[in-house]
Amino acid sequence: MPNGDRTGGGRLQGEGWDRPLPERPLARKATPLDKDLKKIARLERATVETARSSTRIGIALLFILAVCAYVALKGDAFDNTAIVLVAGVVGAYMALNIGANDVANNVGPAVGAQALTLSGALVIAGICETAGALIAGGDVVATVSRGIVDPAGFADPDALILGMLCALLAAALWLNLATWLGAPVSTTHAIVGAVAGSGIAAAGMDAVNWPAMGKIAASWVISPVLGGLIAAGILLIIKFTILYRPDRVAAAKRWVPILVAVMASAFSVYLVMKGLQRLWKPGPAALGLIGLGAFGLAWGAVHPMVTRAAVGLDNRRKSVMQLFTVPLICSAALLSFAHGANDVANAVGPLAAIVGVSSSGTVAMQVAIPFWVMLVGAAGITLGLALFGPRLIRTVGTKITRLDRARAFAIALSAAITVIAASWLGLPVSSTHIALGALFGVGFLREWLDRRRKRGRIRRAQPLPQWAADGLARAEGAAELEDMLRAEKVKKARKRRLVRRSHLLSIAAAWVITVPMTAVLAAGLYAFARAAWAG
């Protein structure tokens, strides 16, 4: 091949290359018609999106109206039907917001790893959330959430009704804002902060159990750190036992059944401790037997399935990822069931308290949750997920860090293990914070491994190609130039980020301000409503 080099005059110099470079065709200048067509296309897209948004809002309003109609039909059962009607509207609004915000953590990783389509995730999450709420959601809830407020502050029935109504509305408004901003937050923390704010407005600062609030503040750090560390550890185990092995398929046949059995064991204990805690509270020995039994059953069922599925797979990472598909779908379903069993009752607790006081006329520390109240919570969450959940599901699944099925499996398994470990240690944790902490932990582990790998490659840099070496040899200061190029490569490798910092900062900020913001909002609503009520 003839030698040649490129000069600044737009010609190639050398034997056989002494000719002008071909001229690039100039881009056609946009005409007024092109600009008008682009404007019309943008207008059409905006019109379609507006129509879709209007349809979603219309369906949500129909659900709220259906709740109103039901409460109106049961009006004879309440001392103050108007208050229960308002509470039903706010409770339905709250349930819609929980579905739009809080459920994304359960199915987002599976969608991001392409183990589930968005439609499939919505169907599975909706069914499992509803089943968890109605089957294992429990029938009793504390009137004043989690011992945050001294019950004496709500000794008057009117004060309790007003406080719970303001707490419910404040938490719902905050969840709505967080969803609009694209920040997944803890429903339980929103309710706790709102109840605390109502308690302060009703009985002063002394009414709040500040040590309990301190534990909740500690969970802002404990939950994501624990979730992230455990998820990163699980992913490292998967990498070193399967993905880094010369024969990945053989390693996967050995280790995937074990990992799935660990997941089944963890979720069995998780569901008993978290989802069924109001129905049954087993001791450590019973939990251990449940975990061992689930491990054995799962391994016996999964091992032959994985062996059959591995037949014909080539020794590529992408092929091995297929073996994690079914376990990942099952984990998303189990997480949704456990969330429905635990968090739905917490969300409708204030509504149940209002209904209980309106029915009996007295204040009780615990009230029974009527079936229709639990149904409002379950149906509202499912509908909110279907109508408004896809945005946050995409954020959790695709916009924070890139996920494959092994990473998503590590996140799901971490959520169950972290909750169990925290419960045994008596640490306050949030399932929402754990799931997102696990997601960030996996992303930061990817960054660390990527930088470590790239620094190793740069240190073992191969000789430059001959054409580049010849050019550098003719340049003044060739050694310095080569050092500069390699230093620039190191700098770029260090700067490469696999976790989007903008999402990290916005989500962390939303976590920190959820409790104080809902408290301030609830206190303001309570003060305003109290003044209007008295007037």
Regions found by a protein language model. Give the residues of each.
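Alpha-helical transmembrane segments and immediately membrane-proximal extracytoplasmic
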Residues: 2-535
